Amino acid sequence: ANYLRNITNRCDLDVHKVKDGEEIDLGGKTLTFISAPNLHWPDSMMTYVKEEKLLLSNDGFGQHLASDGLFVNEQPLDLVVNEAKSYYANILFPYGAQAEKALNTAGTLGLDIEMIAPSHGCIWSGKDEVNTILGPYAKWASGKNEGKAVVVYDSMWGATAKMAETVMAEFQDAGIPVTKHCLAVENVSEVMVDFLDAAYVCIGNPT
C-alpha cells in the first residue's frame, strides 16, 4: 500500500490490501483474489470473477502465441498446450512452488472455473479446455520428471560434440530416453522445454 502511495505521490491514496480468498463485490460482479507471487512478478495476483466462472490468471496458463483468434479452440489444441509448456519452461519454471500454491489455493476455495483468460496468448474456454491445461500445469509445478535425459552442448572443434555423442549413447544403452541439443544451432527456449520434465541434464562446455 505504501509503495503505491509513494510511486503515485499521493499520501492520501485509499488502498485496500487484499488477502488470499478475499472477495470484493463490485455490484453484480464478485471478485475473489489469489496471490501468485513471482508468477512472474513479485506482485502477481490472479482474480476469479464468480458470476462468469472466469479466472483472470495473469501470467499463469499463458502462451507466447501470436494469433488472430482469441480462444484456444480457434487453434490446434496440441499447439496451444505446447506453447503453454514453452511459456512455463522459459518464464515460470523457477517458481514451481508458487505455481503449486496458487493451484492449491484455487482448489481449496472450490472455484468453479469454466474459463481462464491469461495475460498472454489464447483464452481457455469450457470445462474440457480448462481441465486440459490444469492437469499439465499441476505436473509442471510439482517438478515431477518423466525419467528422460537431456544432453546440451556447444563445440568449437568437435571434441565436445564427440563427448556429447558418447554420453547420449550411455543413456541409450541404459534404456533411458534422451535428447541432444547443440546450442550453436538450436534455440535456447526450445531446450528449456526439454529441461522441464527431465530427470538428467548433462551440459558440455568447450574450454
PLM regions with names:
Residues T8-E74:
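Catalytic core of the metallo-beta-lactamase
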Residues V18, I34, W41-S44, K101-N104, ...:
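A generic local structural motif
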Residues D128-T207:
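N-terminal beta1-alpha1-beta2 submodule of the flavodoxin-like/Rossmannoid cofactor-binding fold
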Residues K50, L54-N82, N90-K144:
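Divalent-metal (often Zn2+) His-rich catalytic cores of metallo-beta-lactamase-fold enzymes
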Residues L4-R5, T160:
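Hydrophobic packing residues within well-ordered alpha-helices of enzyme cores
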Residues L31-P37, I91-Y95, P177-L183:
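Short, flexible loop segments at the rims of nucleotide/cofactor-binding pockets, characterized by
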